[in-house]
C-alpha cells in the first residue's frame, strides 16, 4: 500500500518542507512500517505500508482545511 501519511487525530496529511528525499518523511514512513518515504507536494508520501496503516483520507476526518 502507498499513500500520504496522516495524523490520526486531525485527519491531516503530515507536512514536509523539502520536496523529494526527506529524512523526516523517511523516518516517519519507517516508523509506520513502510519501505520508502519522501516529500511529495509538501506532504509525506510513503510506500510499502501494510494495508492496516491509515493513510489520507481517513473516513470521518476532514482536517479542518489544513
Curated annotation (Swiss-Prot):
Cellular component, GO annotation: extracellular region
MF (Gene Ontology): sodium channel inhibitor activity; toxin activity
UniProt KW keywords: Disulfide bond, Ion channel impairing toxin, Neurotoxin, Secreted, Toxin, Voltage-gated sodium channel impairing toxin
Cellular localization per UniProt: Secreted
UniProt entry tagged with the keyword Disulfide bond: yes
Principal place of residence: secreted
Tissue: Expressed by the venom gland.
Gene3D superfamilies for the chain: Knottin, scorpion toxin-like (3.30.30.10)
Superkingdom assignment: Eukaryota
CDD domains in the cross-refs: neurotoxins_LC_scorpion
GO biological process: defense response
Domain notes: Has the structural arrangement of an alpha-helix connected to antiparallel beta-sheets by disulfide bonds (CS-alpha/beta).
Additional observations: Negative results: has no effect on Nav1.8/SCN10A sodium channel from the grasshopper mouse, a species pain-resistant to C.sculpturatus venom.
Protein family membership: Belongs to the long (4 C-C) scorpion toxin superfamily. Sodium channel inhibitor family.
Record protein name field: Toxin NaTx-4
